[in-house]
Amino acid sequence: HFCISSHAVHYWRGRSKEGKPVDARIINTTSGAGLQGSIGQSNYAAAKAGIAALTLNQAAELGRYNITANAVAPSARTGMTSAVPEMAERMAKPEDGSFDHFAPENVSNLLAWLASAEAESVTGRVFEAEGGRICICDGWRTTAGVDSGAAWAPAEIGAAMKALLAEEVPAQQVWGT
C-alpha cells in the first residue's frame, strides 16, 4: 500500500507544483481483522490496522494537493476465503439464486463510488462493506479521561481507572472470541 501510493503521490505532487489540476484518490484495502482484531492472526491484524492508520495519515497529509485517501474493509468471497473450508461454506454463492451476500461486486460498487467525483470531499474514512451494508468505522479516538493535576502515584491509579472504565462503552469484541 505505502510503496504503490508513494509513487502515485510523487506524480500528483509534481503536477500540483507545476500548477496543474489534481483530483486524485487513494483507496486502500484493510480488513475487519485490523479493525477489531482476529484470534490467531495477530500478524495479519496488525498489518491491516497499519493500513487503516496509513490511510488516516495520507488523508491529513495529502488533502492540500486535492488527493483523498480512504480505506475499505471488504467482506467478500475471495481466493483466500475460499481456501478455508469453514469460510468457503459460509460465504458460498446461494444455489437458489437469492441475493449473493458475499459477491465481490457488492464491495466493488463502493470502491467505484469512492473513486468518483461525487466522493471528492470524502477523505480520511475507513469503511466496512459486506453484502448490501456499508458502515463507517470510527476507530481509535480519545474519549473520557481523568487528570490528577500531577504525577500519578501507583496506588491512586486503580481507583481512578475503575471509575473511568465504569463510564466507558465496553471494548470491541475481537473476532473469534
What annotation goes with each model-predicted range?
Residues 5, 47:
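Active-site helix of classical SDR
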Residues 7-22, 117:
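A short helix-coil junction within the Rossmann-fold of NAD(P)-dependent oxidoreductases
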Residues 31:
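Residue(s) in the substrate-gating loop at a strand-loop-helix junction
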Residues 34-36, 78:
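Conserved catalytic-site region of short-chain dehydrogenase/reductase
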Residues 36, 52, 57-67, 117-121:
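Active-site-adjacent segment of SDR/Rossmann-fold oxidoreductases
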Residues 36-42:
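Active-site loop immediately N-terminal to the catalytic Tyr-X3-Lys motif
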Residues 60, 71-101, 139-144:
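A glycine/serine/threonine-rich, flexible loop-to-helix segment
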Residues 92-177:
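C-terminal helical subdomain
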